[in-house]
Amino acid sequence: MKVGVALSGGVDSAVALYLLLKEGHEVKAFHMKTKEDEFFLKKEIKKKVCCSPSDTADAIRIARSLGVEIEIVDVREVFREKVIEPFKRDLLRGLTPNPCVHCNRYVKFGYFMDYVLSQGFDAFASGHYARVEFSGKYGKKVIKKGVDGKKDQSYFLARIEPWRIEKLLFPNGIYTKEEIRRIAEEAGIHVAKKQESQDVCFIPDGSIENFLKDEGITLSEGKVITEKGEVVGHHRGYPLYTVGQRKGLKIEKFGERLYVREKIPESNVVVVSGLEDVFFSGLIAEDPVWHVEVPEEFRCVCRVRKKSEEAPAVVRVRDNEVEVRFEKKVFAVTPGQIAAFYDEDTLLGGAIIKEGIR
């Protein structure tokens, strides 16, 4: 089979490429450029991020060492349109967006995948820790969690278009991270011990404040208030805070620990409350993407952030929204984040959280 492989320059995609070669597939590597190289050279990179010049150099070296052709694909225009601009817009709306999910939907498993398939390839592969398997229950190929629970990346795939699943290969999904590194070492792949990407690729210094400043947006300090309107401190700009956050708030002496309850962009106010008030009994989410057919009401487990615990829930589908009711209250349901739905280890789909239900 002819397979186009997304080669980031990291160990995961390198091993995915290696495994597909071992299986006898005809393989070509493709590397995305989301930002110009100069951007990374001007930034203080505090955490490892993807798509940097060093990643491009590593991707080229990996491909050459494995005897595979590599093509660099410029996705900067679509990346700005579909990821950076919506991210900026959502921050100013008071949301906490997840740019990686949007990148997967519109860029990596959208524009980039379309480009690869247009070159005559039968399948598109990446180094994601997830699996694609045929489901007898649903009568089609589905995305399942990777066997390494700590590294499972299915959450980030919750909103890709369902028709694409038939064309996907995730060779790493049946391995743990430790096994992937061991395979890389045994194969002599030079990035076997390379640090993992940990931050948003277009914010390499980890500062949303600096990102917005670079985009021409200056944040204003505002009041931190309780539900009763009592001023308890000040914030540096509401886009810098998220529901459930406690650190970073300039709160004057108060009788209890306070957490971000909500943000009100119109008045540049951050509302705080006690811990009890940042647990939610449910949520409303919009623009759902379903990988399988689902009934109007069904039970499943829901994940509201990548690292959140899975919460058993009842989901009711209504037009372009879903209402989710949890069996037990869930911490920090955050507008702008993704609610991903699972039937055991099968990913059913995902929707954008509109509001939490207390």
Curated annotation (Swiss-Prot):
Disulfide bond positions: C103-C201
Recorded GO CC terms: cytoplasm
Entry's localization field: Cytoplasm
UniProt-recorded Gene Ontology molecular function terms: ATP binding; tRNA binding; tRNA-uridine 2-sulfurtransferase activity
RNA-binding found in the keyword field: yes
Job of this protein: Catalyzes the 2-thiolation of uridine at the wobble position (U34) of tRNA, leading to the formation of s(2)U34.
Protein name, UniProt field: tRNA-specific 2-thiouridylase MnmA
Source organism of the structure: Thermotoga sp. (strain RQ2)
Annotated gene: mnmA
